Amino acid sequence: MAAVNLPVQVIACCDANGAMQPLRFRFEDAAHALHTVQVCEVLDCRESGYVGIEAFFFLCHAVLDGREKLYELKYTVHTHRWALLREIY
C-alpha cells in the first residue's frame, strides 16, 4: 500500500528504559469521522536517522471495528509528532 503519512493522536507507554510502545491511536478519515484503533501487539520497532531526522517506526497488529489490521506508525523525535504511515492489510 502507498504511504498515507496521516497525522494521528497516540496514547503510548514508556518503560523504565525509555522505550515507547503505542497502546492506541486515533485518526480522521476523508469523511471527517474519527476512528480509534486499539494496538494489540507491536511486532517490530526500528530507529531511523534518515537525513539527520531521528524517528521510530512501529509495526503494529491492531483491531479496528472488530477487524484485525496491520499498521505502520512513525514517531518523529524532534517534533514529537506521530503519523500513520500506511495500512498494510
Question: Which functions belong to the PLM regions below?
Answer:
Residues 1-89:
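Cysteine-centric segments in proteins
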